[in-house]
Curated annotation (Swiss-Prot):
Protein name (database record): Protein translocase subunit SecA
Gene: secA
Keywords from the UniProt entry: ATP-binding, Cell inner membrane, Cell membrane, Cytoplasm, Membrane, Metal-binding, Nucleotide-binding, Protein transport, Translocase, Translocation, Transport, Zinc
MF terms (GO), sorted A to Z: ATP binding; metal ion binding; protein-exporting ATPase activity
Catalytic activity: ATP + H2O + cellular proteinSide 1 = ADP + phosphate + cellular proteinSide 2
Key word Glycosyltransferase present: no
Annotated organism of origin: Brucella anthropi (strain ATCC 49188 / DSM 6882 / CCUG 24695 / JCM 21032 / LMG 3331 / NBRC 15819 / NCTC 12168 / Alc 37) (Ochrobactrum anthropi)
Length: 906
């Protein structure tokens, strides 16, 4: 029975169909003017860029220029690249220009499609970022498509690992910049740790096109980018804790694979308490006493490392390091580390060098980084299953772009076996049969361990012609996958999400030329060799087509339908034939953890014989239902995480904007004056509450505050004895004295040096307090969930307390800045040469008396050190003091010894 919705779609088409129909009409208009552009000379075509820019300067919009700009880019692609964008690629380009996500099947030309909106939007000169998942793709696309952009007079840069700041700045200054999501995000964080705007590398975030957008904005959404600094080395303690876990029995802990949690049972808690006590690391009477919070954290990490994280699935050990493996793509992620001690627990488990824990200096999630762009769009082979998430979180509409030629791939029903062993026997039989008829086969696995187990089975069965692509062989990735379409080739690969390299039947011309002709220079000999390779690939393609095209054989379903669809989509590119099939068992993770209990019992009741499979469309639907449940759960997790991260993100924006304002300020006198007055107002309000009787005043505390925060010794005891004096009068007198001291200091330093000192103190204090604030927010986040047990909304509690922490941080910032500025002095150091004595500005931590940092040296003021009689010394002017003995009374009149007063800063 057809539902009314289904009937309506048949009559009127889906909303996707209607939208495509509208865009196709516009694509037809562009095709209609194609002849006009074909008749232009190269010079006339290149002149179009300047013409379009002049039109924009004259008030025209990008939308009005779209038909002509797309026609220009299409014609340039034909002349420079030898490729003509199809009408469906024009449609995809319009979707990208209009802040959408273009879902385009593998092999349909996403990279070429992107050149159309990239060219159009680059005309504004504000910068266009094309974001890819790895350096190889960023470099490849920048080199290939850069020829097209350069032909049209646009500049192209590429951001990749290993560039210095000058190279990065130059790349970001280009009209078009290719780069990875990681590099762009880290550059943003690093920029917001700089002290001068000239040191920053990025421009404002204008327009980004994200390739493999589902991988970056969905799969990576839970992974924050973090810049961190090392803390103390606790490797011995990690190693000690690690020795406890192998001693545990199954009844000592509980594992929840669905929630990915591991906890100690009561029996297990007693056991580790005994072990800790024997090792002398248990404080108090119980493991859960407040003194043991850090120990419990280490124990939980060690338990997770041993019981939830698997070597060669979640990580590999390489060069004495733990390297994380992306669960979605199977790629290694060197440089990435699990936070909060988990990575150290894994290092202890695998007996590699334990790196020190890190403190977060700056962090941001991809969700919040990419939402900073004025205009964001994306492209991928699979996005429809996550359309709701793209719409809710990023405001991006997903549009499925029709293929240029009909898809001929046959997607067969899944085969389900009772055990993993039976499943693998069936897989080997199927690989052998397809291999013998010369069909290229791509075998998808979910982990390194499983890919290598299957490879070993094939060797034992006498199938030797296969290649393995997983995180261990990451460097050969592009070449291996490019040759996966050669007849008879068997390629075993971990998850194919985001691979970025096309599998072409017969082989990849560009890759073979690079591999075989790298030593032959341009010329007739090279051209002849290329012609031979082309002919060979054409022959091999005919053989592959005759054998049925690429066969995608998957050994397991992934949690995400999207990953499965990406694997299927490797076959049947551009109208080629192909087939796909999934082999499953009841022992697979998805079936075991999330699968339907009814399916399990039903299959067992059928009494299947050994090596017998059940194949039915109902099985596919049941599995899809299980996957939808997982996807919905993961979406809720990401949505919830974003709500918490938005709180920090709002605060991050305030802090980063303040830093930028500080960089641009040429005179901070007014800003610092306001901060000084606010500190004084808070100080007086605390010690002399409004409308309180004089007996309630804390005059001793106020005097202490004035000395510690303002470095002044004022007669507040005498003021308090005056008849009728109120708190406003205290405020005014303290402000007057503090302003006078600050003005005298500014006069001694000179305006240029004073501004530099003020900027340095404010920005470094801000950075230090922001880092502490991030730690405080992490702690708050880790405990606020328990408020739910008290019937309080954890998110609202987090918002309220995070705001209070933020306000407290800003108040603390004012105090720290003013305290340091009221103490900073020019210190004369022994000159290397008498005629050029240097002077150094230092900032002293008022609480420790230690030199907080030493940022600048100046030699444009020159003073001789000499002994000066006390009578000639001006207490307010250290320049008149000359050399003072450290145990002598300080000439400033404070009554303290010089070494405990102004001498403390030398």
């Amino acid at each position: 029975m057809v539902s009314f919705g289904g009937f309506a779609r048949k009559i009127f088409g889906s909303s996707n169909d209607r939208r495509v129909k509208t865009l196709r009409q516009r694509a037809n208009q562009i095709t209609a003017i194609e002849k006009n552009y074909e008749n232009l000379t190269d010079e006339q075509l290149q002149a179009k860029t300047a013409e379009f820019r002049a039109a924009l300067a004259g008030g025209k919009t990008l939308d009005s220029l779209l038909p002509d700009a797309f026609a220009t880019a299409r014609e340039a692609a034909k002349r420079v690249l030898g490729m003509r964008p199809f009408d469906v690629q024009l449609i995809g380009g319009m979707v990208l220009h209009e802040r959408g996500i273009a879902e385009m099947r593998t092999g349909e030309g996403k990279t070429l499609m992107a050149t159309l909106p990239v060219y159009l939007n680059a005309l504004e000169g504000k910068g266009v970022h094309v974001v890819t998942v790895n350096d190889y793709l960023a470099t490849r696309d920048a080199e290939t498509m850069g020829k097209l952009y350069n032909f049209l007079g646009l500049t192209v840069g590429v951001i990749k690992h290993g560039l210095d700041d000058d190279e990065r700045r130059a790349a970001y200054a280009c009209d078009i910049t290719y780069g990875t999501n990681n590099e762009l995000g880290f550059d943003y964080l690093r920029d917001n740790m700089k002290y001068e705007r000239a040191q920053m590398v990025q421009r404002p975030h204008n327009y980004a096109i994200v390739d493999e957008v589902d991988s970056i904005l969905i799969d990576e959404a839970r992974t924050p980018l973090i810049i961190s600094g090392p803390l103390e080395d606790r490797s011995d303690f990690y190693n000690l804790i690690d020795t406890f876990i192998p001693a545990l029995e199954p009844e000592d802990f509980e594992i929840d694979e669905k929630q990915k949690t591991a906890i100690f049972t009561e029996v297990g808690t007693e056991k580790v308490e005994q072990l800790l006590e024997a090792a002398g690391h248990l404080k108090g009477e119980s493991l859960y006493d407040i003194e043991n919070v850090a120990v419990v954290h280490h124990l939980n990490n060690a338990l997770r490392a041993h019981k939830l994280f698997q070597r060669d699935k979640d990580y590999i050990v390489r060069n004495d390091e733990i390297v994380i493996i992306d669960e979605f793509t199977g790629r290694m992620m060197p440089g990435r580390r699990y936070s909060e001690g988990l990575h150290q627990a894994l290092e202890a488990k695998e007996h590699v060098t334990i790196q020190p824990e890190n403190q977060t200096l700056a962090s941001i999630t991809f969700q919040n980084y990419f939402r900073m762009y004025n205009k964001l769009s994306g492209m991928t082979g699979t996005a429809a299953t996550e359309a709701e998430e793209f719409g809710n979180i990023y405001g991006l509409e997903v549009l499925e772009i029709p293929t240029n030629l009909p898809v001929q791939r046959i997607d067969e029903d899944d085969e389900v076996y009772r055990s993993v062993e039976e499943k693998y026997r069936a897989i080997v039989r199927d690989i052998r049969a397809s291999h013998e008829k010369g069909q290229p086969i791509l075998v998808g696995t979910t982990s390194i361990e499983k890919s290598e187990q299957l490879a070993e089975r094939l060797r034992k069965e006498g199938i030797k012609e296969f290649q393995v692509l997983n995180a261990r062989y990451h460097e050969q990735e592009a070449y291996i996958i490019a040759q996966a379409g050669v007849p008879g080739t068997v390629t075993i690969a971990t998850n194919m999400a985001g691979r970025g390299t096309d599998i072409q039947l017969g082989g990849n011309l560009e890759m073979r030329v690079r591999q075989e002709l790298s030593d032959i220079p341009e010329g007739p000999e090279r051209d002849a060799k290329i012609a031979e390779i082309k002919a060979d690939i054409a022959q091999l393609k005919e053989k592959a087509l005759a054998a049925g095209g690429l066969y995608v054989l998957a050994t397991e379903r992934h949690e995400s339908r999207r990953i499965d669809n990406q694997l299927r989509g490797r076959s049947g590119r551009q109208g080629d034939p192909g087939r796909s099939k999934f082999f499953l068992s009841l022992q697979d993770d998805l079936m075991r953890i999330f699968g339907s209990d009814r399916m399990d019992s039903m299959l067992q009741k059928l009494g299947l014989k050994e090596d017998e499979a059940i194949v039915h469309p109902w099985i596919n639907k049941a599995l899809e239902k299980a996957q939808k449940k997982v996807e919905a759960r993961n979406f809720e997790i990401r949505k919830n995480l974003l709500k918490y991260d938005d709180v920090m993100n709002d605060q991050r924006k305030v802090i980063f904007e303040q830093r930028l304002e500080m960089m641009d300020e040429e005179d901070l006198t007014e800003t610092v004056g306001e901060m000084r007055h606010e500190v004084i107002e808070d100080m007086v309000a605390l010690r002399i509450p409004k409308d309180a009787y004089a007996e309630k005043w804390d005059i001793a505390g106020l005097k202490e505050d004035i000395i510690s925060k303002l470095n002044l010794d004022l007669p507040v005891e005498d003021w308090a004895k005056e008849e009728g004096i109120a708190e406003e009068e205290f405020e005014n007198r303290i402000k007057e004295a503090a302003d006078k001291a600050a003005a005298e200091k500014a006069e001694r330093f000179g305006p240029q040096i004073m501004t530099y000192v003020e900027k340095s103190v404010i920005m470094q204090s801000l950075d230090n307090l922001w880092r502490e604030h991030l730690v405080n927010l992490d702690h708050l986040r880790s405990v606020v969930g328990f408020r739910g047990y008290a019937q309080r909304d954890p998110l609202n509690e987090y918002k309220t307390e995070a705001f209070e922490l933020f306000q407290s941080m800003l108040a603390n910032l004012r105090e720290v800045v003013i305290s340091q500025l009221m103490r900073v002095e020019i210190v004369r150091e022994a000159p290397p040469e008498p005629e050029l004595p240097p002077m150094t500005g230092r900032h002293i931590d008022s609480t420790t008396g230690e030199n907080d940092f030493d940022e600048a040296s100046w030699s444009d003021h020159q003073h001789d050190e000499r002994n000066v009689p006390a009578a000639e010394r001006d207490p307010a002017d250290p320049r008149t003091w000359g050399k003072v003995s450290r145990n002598e009374a300080c000439p400033c009149g404070s009554g303290k010894k010089y070494k405990h007063c102004h001498g403390a800063f030398e």
